[in-house]
Amino acid sequence: MKEIGIETEYITLGQLLKMTDTISSGGMAKWFLSEHEVSVNGEAEDRRGRKLRPEDTVNIPGTGEFRIVVAEGMSFDAH
């Protein structure tokens, strides 16, 4: 499982798809999520605006499994 460090309270699922090079533009997120079974914390998710916070895990078919973490040097209350 790969870790994705974030410097904000959360990122959206659409942002994660771009960060992992799963899609080349944000406009592709809705299409990708309608065609592929992405899961967040083990549950199917098709909303590109889904907020991902530290400790969330995301499985993207063909790309891999990711865990959201607080970026090194950052500190904030994750929940």
Language-model segments: residues:
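A basic, amphipathic helix-loop patch mediating RNA/tRNA/ribosome contacts
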Residues: T12-P54
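Low-complexity, intrinsically disordered short peptide segments enriched in small/polar/basic residues
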Residues: M1-E3, E35, T57
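A detector for short, charged/polar N-terminal pre-domain segments
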Residues: M1-I11
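C-terminal structural segments of small proteins and small subunits
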Residues: G49-H79
